[in-house]
Structure formats: C-alpha cells, structure tokens
C-alpha cells in the first residue's frame, strides 16, 4: 500500500535544475535512504515532502491525497533536522512535549505520551535535565523522541547519524528500527553512507552531484 507518491516534481535553484519531472513511490512502513554527496538535492526533497519548500511544480500525495489539501497540523509528516534544535531553556520533558502543547493535547495525555516515548528512546532518567547536561548522542535521542511522539505516518530524517561516534550511531540506528516496528512508521533518511542503509535494510535512492533527477 502506497503512503507517499511524488508526481512530476520539478525544482530549480539559482537557474540550476535539481529535479526534472521526478517521480517516486513509497510503500507503508518502508525505510528509504537518500544517498549522495552534499548539495545534490536530498535535503531539498525532504523539505518539498514536508511542505517547507513550496517553490516547485508537481504533486506530493500522502495516502493518495495532495498534501496541499491537508492542513499543516494534520499532515502526519515530521521532519527532523541534522541540528537537534533543542530549546536550551526547557527541560527534556518540555522539549519533547512542545509540539503536543502547540496542538493543545490534554495535560494528562501529554504526560503519558512523553513517558511512553521516553521509555522507547531510553530517556526515562533524563526528563528533568536540560540539553546542556546531555551528550551529543543523548541530545539526538531527544530530537528523535520529539519527532515521533505524535506517531507520524511519515518520518523524515536529515542526516540523523552524522557527527556521532560508532557506538552512539549504532544505538540511534537501532532506535530507528524500533520506531518503524513499534509505531508502524514509514521512514526516509538522508545519508552519505551506504552502510547505514544496509544496516537498516533500507531501499535507497542514489543522488549524484551535478545531475538532475
């Protein structure tokens, strides 16, 4: 069953064609890796899918519905950036709950959801701490927890394993596996490293610098 369809996506940047009538189909609960060097359009495509980039032609369909016809807060698509973008003045609990508070979930429901995702992402003992008290790998886990707390249908990860040492990288990759299996989430991630796609048993799309798709 298809969850994401891109139809005839065209996009240019500074007179350079990045996508030229690009088509793509993703099935539910798949993991797909976008592999290639910097500057070849991988992150741009995530932004097109997520709705942050709107200056393109073509159609992005989620479950067969054009995303432009779905209110932003109902799209069930979450993008996690390479920079963790945590709020330094908020506790880890407050960082994770932020999107739920914006959507005005009931307080008792928020608490339950934060505690559940904190357990899944191994953050139970960090909820009262602040980002500066956590290591880089722990901060990445917080960003991941915040991204998946609403259990989106589609999770977009922009270089989620970059800048991590080997042990922490493996830990984060295993958490991505857990998210897909437990939350039935479809996942697209950007990487430069084919071994990450192989470890996650992901299908992959290869991007080449200087060539449009």
What residues fall within each predicted segment?
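Helix-to-loop junction immediately C-terminal to a conserved catalytic motif
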Residues: 50
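Conserved ABC ATPase "signature" region
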Residues: 108-126, 177-178
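ABC ATPase NBD coupling module
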Residues: 66-81
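A short, proline-enriched helix->beta-strand linker immediately N-terminal to the Walker B motif
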Residues: 149-153
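Conserved ABC ATPase signature
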Residues: 130-134, 138
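Hydrophobic anchor residue at the start of the ABC signature
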Residues: 144
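Catalytic Walker B motif of ABC-type/P-loop ATPase nucleotide-binding domains
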Residues: 155-158
């Amino acid at each position: 069953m298809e969850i994401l369809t891109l139809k005839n996506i065209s996009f240019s940047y500074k007179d350079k064609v990045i996508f030229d009538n690009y088509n793509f189909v993703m099935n539910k609960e798949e993991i797909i890796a976008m592999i290639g060097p910097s500057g070849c359009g991988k992150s741009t495509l995530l932004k097109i899918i997520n709705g942050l980039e709107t200056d393109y032609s073509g159609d992005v369909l989620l479950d067969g519905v054009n995303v432009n016809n779905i209110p932003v807060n109902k799209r069930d698509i979450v993008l996690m950036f390479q920079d963790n973008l945590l709020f330094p003045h908020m506790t880890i609990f407050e960082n994770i709950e932020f999107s739920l508070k914006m959507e005005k979930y009931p307080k008792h429901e928020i608490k339950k959801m934060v505690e559940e995702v904190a357990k899944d992402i191994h953050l139970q003992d960090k909820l009262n701490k602040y980002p500066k008290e956590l290591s880089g790998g722990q901060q990445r886990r917080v960003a991941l927890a915040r991204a998946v707390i609403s259990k989106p249908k589609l999770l977009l990860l922009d270089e989620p394993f970059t800048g991590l040492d080997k042990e922490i990288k493996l830990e984060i990759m295993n958490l991505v596996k857990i998210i897909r299996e437990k939350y039935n989430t479809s996942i697209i991630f950007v990487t430069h490293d084919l071994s990450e796609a192989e470890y996650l048993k992901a299908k992959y799309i290869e991007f080449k610098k200087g060539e449009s798709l």
